[in-house]
Amino acid sequence: MTFSHHHAPARRDVDMTQGSITRHLIQFALPLLAGNVFQQLYNMVDTWVVGNFVSNEAFSAVGTVGPIINMLIGFFMGLSSGAGVVISQYYGAHRPEKVRDTVHTAMVLTLVLCAVFTALGLALIPAMLDLMNTPAEVLPESTAYLSIYFSGITGLLIYNMGSGILRAVGDSRRPFYFLVVSAVLNTGLDLLFVIRFHMGVAGVAWATIIAQAVSAVLVLAVLMRTDSCVRVELRRLRVHWDMLKKIVRVGIPAALQMAVTAFSNVFVQSYINHFGADCMSGWTAYTKIDQLMFLPMQSLALSATTFVGQNLGAGDTPRAQQGVRRALGISLAVTAVLMVPVLLFAPQLTAFFNRKAEVVAYGTLLLRYISPFYLLCCINQIYSGALRGAGNSQVPMVIMLGSFVVFRQIYLYIMSHYITNTLLPLAMGYPAGWLVCSAATLLYYRRAALGRQRLVEDN
């Protein structure tokens, strides 16, 4: 990597087609992991500020809109990954002119989506809240929050797409720096708007979109000043239809998969709610730890996506496959190491979120029964990440939706209606879904030759 001093901004892109596989995977995954942990932390700060300085209704309101926002973020991340895969393959193939076309097409697509989602989002707020059975006392707060959020959604889209472009050429560091700036700013504005100016839920929403706007501006500044092939120039902004087709082919299935997976947890939640408030709180504590357990494998799955993309683009299938095996090995090892303290200290971890004895009992039960199954998740995360890097996101989408949504819903329905309405069999809906998903993904990955799936046409 070359660093230049004053004149041109340094190139931070990383060519993953040469050099140590393990080092590439880990160096790429670490900023992603740190960024994700940071995001979880500032979500927690958001929740803490609202829970302690605004009303109980406000706390529920922010909780209610959570799934809607996660679904949106999932959708954009999937779409950005589509552009990222196309870019990483052309980058690996050393076709800078194609990279340039893809980048500009992706930016035009993003700007169009900004307009569409702002308008649609604002128009559909009542319908969305109605669909989620939002309690009447929470409606005004939820509506206010979403109205502000959708008005400023442009920042979120631009940041996501811009980060996706940078990651495709191996730069996961700068998106991380921008995330940190955004998180710190968000926290500061939260405290200022909510505690100092007493703006309530609206203050939290404003803090979020201002912070996102700043990260979008930072990403754009880098893309417009970089001297690598992903440089964005206003005069080149136009749609290259052949590139758009490729972005959509990978991006839409990935977007649907991420959006629906984010939303399918809402259905599980409704089954958990039957067991009363203590169980709900125990489940909430469990999900917080669950999210942290998932981060290492998710970061490595993204590493695998970029790694496979670049190496297939370069025509080096064996190296791509070796990278996938290595990523799986690392993620299994890291997850196994993380599982030990979770199993040992489950009561203390739950008590960190809620000290009530019944809540701790529920949280401990869930953590101890479900966490050994995280090893299964490594399999489906890494392999579907690898397949997506190869440009095949349709099959992983079908497998994931089949096992996380269809299978899990049928399982929960049959369990709760015909067998037993006790907590553990229902909570096992998660591992059962993971088992089906991992088995199917593994079988498919074994049969599908990675190399046949390149998006890059030979010269």
Regions found by a protein language model. Name each.
Residues 16-53, 67-82, 86, 111-118, ...:
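N-terminal transmembrane alpha-helices
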Residues 54-67, 142-146, 205, 277-292, ...:
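Small-residue hotspots at the loop-to-helix junctions and early N-terminal turns
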Residues 32, 36, 48, 85, ...:
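Transmembrane alpha-helix boundary and packing residues in multipass membrane permease domains
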Residues 1-29, 87-152, 196-252, 308-373, ...:
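Short alpha-helical transmembrane segments in multi-pass integral membrane proteins
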Residues 37, 41-59, 129-136, 192-199, ...:
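Helix-terminus/linker motif at the lipid-water interface of multi-pass membrane proteins
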Residues 59-119, 156-175, 269, 282-346, ...:
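Small-residue-rich hydrophobic transmembrane alpha-helices
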Residues 80, 148-167, 175-183, 204-219, ...:
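Short runs within selected transmembrane alpha-helices of multi-pass transporters and secretion channels
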Residues 27-46, 148, 159, 182, ...:
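Transmembrane helical elements of multi-pass membrane transporters/channels
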